[in-house]
Amino acid sequence: MVTLITEKLQSQSLDDLTCKAEAGPLQYSAETLNKSGRLFPLELNDQSPWKVFSGGPPVRSQAATGPDFSFLPGLSAAAHTMGLQWQPQSPRPGAGLGAASTVDPSESTGSSTAPPTKRHCRSLSEPEELVRCRSPWRPGSSKVWTPVSKRRCDSGGSATRQGSPGAVLPRSAVWSTGPTSPATPRPSSASGGFVDSSEGSAGSGPLWCSAESCLPSTRRRPSLSQERLAGAGTPLPWASSSPTSTPALGGRRGLLRCRSQPCVLSGKRSRRKRRREEDARWTRPSLDFLKMTQTLKNSKSLCSLNYEDDDEDDTPVKTVLSSPCDSRGLPGITMPGCSQRGLRTSPVHPNLWASRESVTSDGSRRSSGDPRDGDSVGEEGVFPRARWELDLEQIENN
């Protein structure tokens, strides 16, 4: 797109068009018009030709007797051979082509107010930079061609001269409507062909004017066609957009970009989960590791279970499990006051139950008055020396 625009601008500049326009009614061949990028030979409806009058918008003449253009509708091929004539009815020095305007700045007295303060939508707003890029030719809306909205044009177009010498358009040229322009949209018959929309077209056509009398119009175009950007002299802005050229980009900086940065958000979530796991890890264990280490340290046999913190209420149960009394008493009812010999009379496996007897028969040994048990009354379950002696006594008794 940029290369096409550059080639068109190199082939014929705006100054050539202005100089030829000041010479009066001239003949333009189709090749020259195609190279200029300003005017294109398209079909015109002979029932509604548009005539340009000096100092006002173009007026539609009902009679087809005096058309402004010398070619007939549908004969675009004939336009290449015969050439095209553009004849305003009253030739003025201000009659120009392309971006030149025939409206005198003193005559544009149309009621125009200030533009809206806020641009609610970029497609509905038309910035001042687009005025420099607008091309006057626009094809009519049809089933094949539909205008496509473009991004805002930030290119600084070259200033074009009006017909009067010395009057140069400023860079901040804006749109204004004619004095008798209604609010109705432009008819489709005027959209196509050789009608110079810069001359002013009923309501929506642009008018080029100087900075003294031009004010931006309240009505703005909703779409920007590709042909309006044909007159740009610099590369188009979508190659490198900035927050100044596109104000919508500035507000997006503070927003979260979840789709483009998923790893950052996932890392934050994982860190929060790890903190929760660390907090729950300290309340999680329900086992007493101190007791487990003490049991493993003090046990010398597989069946030794040393409970240092047990009360005396658990001793009869352990006595029942370890060594029941003789067959004369009930096996399930065993008191801690029974004799030590009665506890040792009928052990099924003396080696297995030896450690538990040492724990549960403290009271019986106290009654028997064994001198060896006086020093280690509370330490029988901890030290295995007394346990091995008890095992030897059980073997001798059996």
Swiss-Prot record:
Q: Give residue spans, biased composition: Low complexity.
A: 176-193, 234-250
Here the segments flagged for biased composition (Polar residues) are 103-115
Q: Which UniProt keywords apply?
A: Nucleus, Phosphoprotein
- Give the record's GO biological process terms: protein import into nucleus
Location within or outside the cell: Nucleus
Listed under GO cellular component are: nucleus
Name assigned to this protein: Protein FAM53A
Which Pfam families does the entry mention?
FAM53
**What does it do?**
May play an important role in neural development; the dorsomedial roof of the third ventricle.
Q: Where is the composition biased (Basic and acidic residues)?
A: 123-132, 363-375
Question: Which residue intervals make up region (Disordered)?
Answer: 85-253, 336-398
Q: Which family is annotated? A: Belongs to the FAM53 family.
Q: Where is this motif: Nuclear localization signal?
A: 268-276
Q: InterPro entries, from UniProt?
A: FAM53 (IPR029356)
The protein's predominant localisation is nucleus
Q: Which domain of life is it from?
A: Eukaryota
At which residues is Phosphoserine found? Answer: S125, S301, S304
